[in-house]
């Protein structure tokens, strides 16, 4: 029996999950979990990338302690951030987080030189200041000139493990530098940044064998002999692979620190309507495209908890929230002011004050406000998606950590007026494992993998119901007018 390890690292935590296929059912075991985050060093918010590597080795040692001598391994992480590699193969600096303030106004500045419509027509990617395009636009020229290669985070981890440099396509598409038509890094865009296209590794599809873990790591650490497979390395791409969807008329919501809501399509949509609504066409596994909107997620709730010194669990916060009427206060969760404020609670209160609403005071009121606002935003985006694609959405599959928030799932079902299916919460790791198993011939296809997922995990169901959607939508429009 083959053993598979998913290295799944998000913005706030990481985990190594052991998976195997037994009687057409996936069995998972969490082997190691660790915290992730950025710290302010050398003038920027930076990831502790060396510590992440150490956590991976600790996890792999735990795998071997189970008596597993050989395994297959895949890596997925968050998108857009990168590591600059020098001529000798060394890391030039710890990577800067997408939440760093260096890219403030970068979109505006670059698009004043290079029209938005032109960039969108080429790439089909949503305009966000965190995109790699804008990070490189403001990167220190000295570092860029010294860099031989630019590797996104999961590709860097794969490189450290195997010595092989690649640019996996699902994650590379998040950079806003891939040309949709040519299926390559766009030389014209890169030349505008004075970056040679050769600084990027060869584009590689999800499901491609990368290589064996280097001998030096086997000697330094007591870990299994691992074959590394390049999975869908962008965590959302893996989460979509891990979505237990069936049929055609469905949408997905990968709910975690961010909310990524969209549809899986066979061709991109980069027309005027998609451009106007700032939709993105991220590449998916096996020739698909993730037509989606990247919006705020549970980050706001996580920050409320942090400001409260974690006195309440997330379950307790949701329970407290249920004691208040929904939609008493509505915030625009996608407002940039909520990206990384000094104090999230104060920012929400100030927003409500500025928009003529009552100010939420308790932990329950604040949580109620955020969950209601998120559900409203989801429903509005599903409405826009239907208009742009011309496809009727009948089901929404919510995966990731947010699939455990029953209150948010039920509010979304009511506002959107469609059935909502929630789970699995570990869809990203599951999608990672499924791609490995397809590579190894244990699963035939992504469709077959999704059937196995449906048979392996409990999926929650939430029915649509009556709600004052149009009235709430009108109130939200008035709130936006204050801005």
Swiss-Prot record:
Gene3D superfamilies assigned: 3.30.420.40
Family, per entry: Belongs to the rhamnulokinase family.
Catalytic reactions of this protein: L-rhamnulose + ATP = L-rhamnulose 1-phosphate + ADP + H(+)
CDD domains xrefs: ASKHA_NBD_FGGY_RhaB-like
Assigned EC number: 2.7.1.5
CC terms in the record's Gene Ontology section: cytosol
Keywords, ordered alphabetically: ATP-binding, Disulfide bond, Kinase, Magnesium, Nucleotide-binding, Rhamnose metabolism, Transferase
Superkingdom of origin organism: Bacteria
Binding site for ATP: 11-15, 257, 302, 401
GO molecular function list: ATP binding; glycerol kinase activity; rhamnulokinase activity
Gene for this chain: rhaB
Annotated S-S bridges: 352-369
Pfam families for this protein: FGGY_C (PF02782), FGGY_N (PF00370)
GO biological process, one term: glycerol metabolic process
HAMAP family assigned: Rhamnulokinase (MF_01535)
Pathway: Carbohydrate degradation; L-rhamnose degradation; glycerone phosphate from L-rhamnose: step 2/3
Record: active site: 235 (proton acceptor)
Function of the protein: Involved in the catabolism of L-rhamnose (6-deoxy-L-mannose). Catalyzes the transfer of the gamma-phosphate group from ATP to the 1-hydroxyl group of L-rhamnulose to yield L-rhamnulose 1-phosphate.
Known cofactor(s): Mg(2+)
Residues noted as binding substrate in the record, renumbered to the chain: 79, 234-236, 294
Protein name per its UniProtKB record: Rhamnulokinase
Entry keyword Transferase: yes
């Amino acid at each position: 029996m083959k053993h598979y390890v998913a290295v799944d690292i998000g913005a706030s935590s990481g985990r190594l999950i052991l998976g195997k296929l037994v009687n057409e059912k996936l069995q998972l075991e969490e082997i190691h979990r660790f915290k992730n985050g950025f710290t302010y060093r050398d003038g920027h918010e930076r990831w502790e990338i060396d510590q992440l590597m150490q956590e991976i080795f600790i996890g792999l040692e735990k795998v071997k302690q189970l008596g597993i001598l050989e395994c297959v391994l895949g890596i997925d992480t968050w998108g857009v951030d990168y590591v600059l590699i020098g001529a000798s193969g060394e890391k030039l600096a710890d990577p800067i987080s997408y939440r760093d303030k260096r890219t403030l106004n970068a979109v505006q500045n670059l698009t004043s030189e290079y029209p938005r419509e032109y960039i969108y027509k080429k790439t089909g990617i949503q305009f966000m200041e965190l995109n790699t395009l804008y990070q490189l636009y403001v990167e220190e020229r000295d570092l860029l000139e010294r860099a031989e290669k630019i590797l996104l985070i999961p590709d860097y981890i794969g490189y450290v493990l195997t010595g092989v440099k690649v640019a996996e396509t699902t994650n590379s598409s998040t950079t806003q530098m891939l040309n949709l038509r040519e299926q390559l890094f766009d030389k014209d865009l890169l030349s505008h940044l004075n970056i040679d296209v050769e600084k990027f590794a060869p584009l590689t599809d999800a499901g491609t064998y990368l290589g064996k873990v280097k001998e030096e790591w086997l000697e330094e650490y007591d870990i299994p002999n691992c074959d590394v497979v390049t999975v869908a390395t962008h965590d959302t791409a893996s989460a979509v692979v891990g979505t237990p969807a069936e049929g055609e008329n469905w949408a997905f919501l990968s709910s975690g620190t961010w909310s990524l809501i969209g549809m899986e399509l066979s061709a991109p949509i980069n027309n005027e309507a998609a451009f106007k609504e700032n939709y993105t066409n991220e590449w998916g596994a096996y020739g698909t495209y993730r037509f989606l909107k990247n919006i705020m997620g549970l980050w706001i709730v996580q920050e409320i908890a942090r400001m409260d010194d974690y006195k309440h669990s997330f379950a307790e916060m949701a329970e407290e929230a249920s004691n208040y009427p929904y939609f008493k206060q509505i915030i625009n969760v996608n407002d940039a002011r909520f990206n990384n404020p000094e104090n999230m609670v104060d920012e929400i209160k100030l927003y409500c004050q500025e928009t003529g609403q009552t100010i939420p005071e308790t932990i329950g009121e604040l949580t109620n406000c955020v969950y209601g606002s998120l559900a409203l935003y989801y429903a509005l985006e599903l409405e826009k998606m239907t208009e742009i694609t011309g496809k009727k959405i009948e089901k929404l599959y919510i995966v990731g950590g947010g699939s455990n928030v029953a209150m948010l799932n039920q509010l979304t079902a009511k506002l959107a007026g469609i059935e909502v299916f929630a789970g699995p919460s570990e869809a990203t790791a599951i999608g990672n494992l499924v791609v490995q198993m397809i590579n190894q011939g244990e699963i035939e296809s992504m469709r077959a993998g999704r059937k196995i997922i449906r048979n392996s995990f409990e999926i929650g169901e939430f029915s649509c119901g009556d709600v004052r959607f149009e009235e709430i939508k009108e109130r939200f429009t008035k709130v936006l007018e204050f801005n």
